[in-house]
Swiss-Prot record:
Binds 2 heme b groups non-covalently. A ubiquinone binds at H202. This is Cytochrome b. Heme 1 (or BL or b562) is low-potential and absorbs at about 562 nm, and heme 2 (or BH or b566) is high-potential and absorbs at about 566 nm. It comes from Podospora anserina (strain S / ATCC MYA-4624 / DSM 980 / FGSC 10383) (Pleurage anserina). InterPro entries: Cyt_b/b6_C (IPR005798), Cyt_b/b6_C_sf (IPR036150), Cyt_b/b6_N (IPR005797), Cytb/b6-like_sf (IPR027387), Cytochrome_b (IPR030689), Cytochrome_b_C_euk/bac (IPR048260), Cytochrome_b_N_euk/bac (IPR048259), Di-haem_cyt_TM (IPR016174). It is found in: Mitochondrion inner membrane. Keywords: Electron transport, Heme, Iron, Membrane, Metal-binding, Mitochondrion, Mitochondrion inner membrane, Respiratory chain, Transmembrane, Transmembrane helix, Transport, Ubiquinone. Component of the ubiquinol-cytochrome c reductase complex (complex III or cytochrome b-c1 complex) that is part of the mitochondrial respiratory chain. The b-c1 complex mediates electron transfer from ubiquinol to cytochrome c. Contributes to the generation of a proton gradient across the mitochondrial membrane that is then used for ATP synthesis. The lineage of its organism: Eukaryota, Fungi, Dikarya, Ascomycota, Pezizomycotina. Its cofactor is heme b. Pfam families: Cytochrom_B_C, Cytochrome_B. Belongs to the cytochrome b family. GO terms for biological process: mitochondrial electron transport, ubiquinol to cytochrome c. Fungal cytochrome b-c1 complex contains 10 subunits; 3 respiratory subunits, 2 core proteins and 5 low-molecular weight proteins. Cytochrome b-c1 complex is a homodimer.
Length: 387
């Protein structure tokens, strides 16, 4: 045990994973961190393995994926692990963010942790988009064309930037090469950001807790208590992920991507992966191209407003019934946006998308501050009546 506290590197591991004191009342909703770390490890291992057999060339990319599936030993397993863990990664990240919103994890002194987490989400979205292009099926090509074309909405220089990204006048060999290089690089940047996220959490106030009060009254060490608690959810996660990988490998994908990319034939509907659909729905709900792009990016950055707009006196929504109701309305609205992102651009989906987009932004800018002020006033009135 002594070496864990004296060795310069093991000392860090000890302070984060063994002796780190945690509030004694944190629930299973605080287990997402370990699950997300497991997802990142799986993604890097499977991604590097896939990169050994992948060819970033427009003529060979699709066939190299088929080669991985058919000829490489357990290549099908590595590929399906990579694609399904990507979905699991985003699913858990959304739950992690939702838990943070519900329990007020964005409030001081954890604002820096929240800000770094938002940057992690942005890097994840970019990485996922780049990875979706690499198989070079129909949805890969047209998804890349549509999303990169959004940059052309920037006044004056937009089209030049798009051609710079493409390395030509359309998605071509240069595009695929640079997307592959960036997709390989970004997960390692993600690792650095995750370490920053952990350091910011560890060096401020540590984990919050379901009551929203100081956790200093009763704390226990991370090992063995929370280590074993994390292992329970890790085993459940492995079981669920395995059921997807082995029995429902393509249920979260798009069948269009099993058709080789054809620049001469547009798919019936161009949709991204399910985890990017809410932001895609926001993009499509605004007719103006530039405003749509701004709204899409603003939708991701909107969670950064919470430390400013939440004016409530108590941390978290556990004892704030109005805020709790508003939060669940927001969750349902987010799921509606996800569904609308996969629908065709036609009535009534356009109007529903516009309403949902207005409600999405309204939650952060109007609903959260107004409800928190109403709750503060009700608490004050109750205190005065009792006084």
């Amino acid at each position: 045990m002594r070496i864990l506290k004296s060795h310069p590197l093991l000392k860090l591991v000890n302070s984060y994973l063994i002796d780190a004191s945690q509030p004694s009342n944190i629930s299973y909703l605080w287990n997402f961190g370990s699950l997300l770390l497991l997802c990142l490890i799986i993604q890097i291992i499977t991604g590097v393995t896939l990169a050994m057999h992948y060819s970033p060339n427009v003529l060979e990319a699709f066939n190299s994926i088929e080669h991985i599936m058919r000829d490489v030993n357990n290549g099908w397993l590595v590929r399906y692990l990579h694609s399904n863990t990507a979905s699991a990664f985003f699913f858990l990240v959304y739950l992690h963010i939702g838990r943070g919103m519900y329990y007020g994890s964005y409030r001081a002194p954890r604002t820096l942790v929240w800000a770094i987490g938002t940057v992690i989400l942005i890097v994840m979205i970019v990485t996922a988009f780049l990875g979706y292009v690499l198989p070079y099926g129909q949805m890969s090509l047209w998804g890349a064309t549509v999303i990169t074309n959004l940059v052309s909405a920037i006044p004056w220089i937009g089209q030049d930037i798009v051609e710079f990204i493409w390395g030509g006048f359309s998605v071509n060999n240069a595009t695929l090469n640079r997307f592959f290089a960036l997709h390989y690089l970004l997960p390692f940047i993600l690792v650095a950001l995750v370490l920053m996220h952990l350091i910011a959490l560890h060096d401020t106030a540590g984990s919050s807790n379901p009551l929203g009060i100081s956790g200093n009254y009763d704390r226990i060490t991370f090992a063995p208590y929370y280590l074993f608690k994390d292992l329970i959810t890790i085993f459940i996660f492995i079981f669920v992920l395995s059921s997807f990988v082995f029995f429902m490998s393509n249920v979260l994908g798009d069948s269009e991507n099993y058709i080789m990319a054809n620049p001469m034939q547009t798919p019936a509907a161009i949709v991204p992966e399910w985890y990017l659909l809410p932001f895609y729905a926001i993009l499509r709900s605004i007719p103006n191209k530039l405003l749509g792009v701004i709204a899409m990016f603003a939708a991701i950055l909107a969670i950064m407003l919470l430390p400013i707009t939440d004016l409530g006196r108590s941390k978290g929504l556990q004892f704030r019934p109005l805020s709790k109701f508003a939060f669940w309305v927001f969750v349902v609205n987010f799921l509606i946006l996800m569904k609308l992102g996969a629908c065709h651009v036609e009535t009534p989906f356009i109007e529903l998308g516009q309403l949902s987009t207005a409600l999405y932004f309204g939650h952060f800018i109007i609903i959260v501050p107004i409800i928190s002020l109403i709750e503060n006033t009700l608490v004050d009135l109750n205190t005065m009546s009792k006084g």
